[in-house]
UniProtKB/Swiss-Prot annotation:
Chain's gene name: rplQ
Family the entry assigns: Belongs to the bacterial ribosomal protein bL17 family.
Matching NCBIfam families: L17 (TIGR00059)
Source organism of this protein record: Synechococcus sp. (strain CC9902)
PANTHER family named in the record: LARGE RIBOSOMAL SUBUNIT PROTEIN BL17M, RIBOSOMAL PROTEIN L17
Identification of the protein by name: Large ribosomal subunit protein bL17
Amino acid sequence: MRHQCRVPQLGRPADQRKAMLRALTTQLIREGRVTTTKARAKALRDEAERMITLAKDGSLASRRRAIGYIYDKQLVHALFDKAPTRYGERKGGYTRITRTVPRRGDNAEMAIIELV
């Protein structure tokens, strides 16, 4: 039984869930906004904010952790260059989740997650 497990399952095995969140995080950092389901957006928020916090730190160890998570190495370098100036005094809350209309096919709750 999954009593008090805080990780959202998202209907996938662990390896597929991790790959999906890595891909969504990479796309969010590249594009600035992603349209996805509400549950995925909430799970994505934790990962994206963790990567931005690493970028604000700016150390070599933080850069290596981000390179190990984000699929595009050049995107990591760009994030580490612009994050300290863009989010310097902000302590958290780097993303915003906005609910949109339900998906037409299965009526799933949709949301737009974007970088603030």
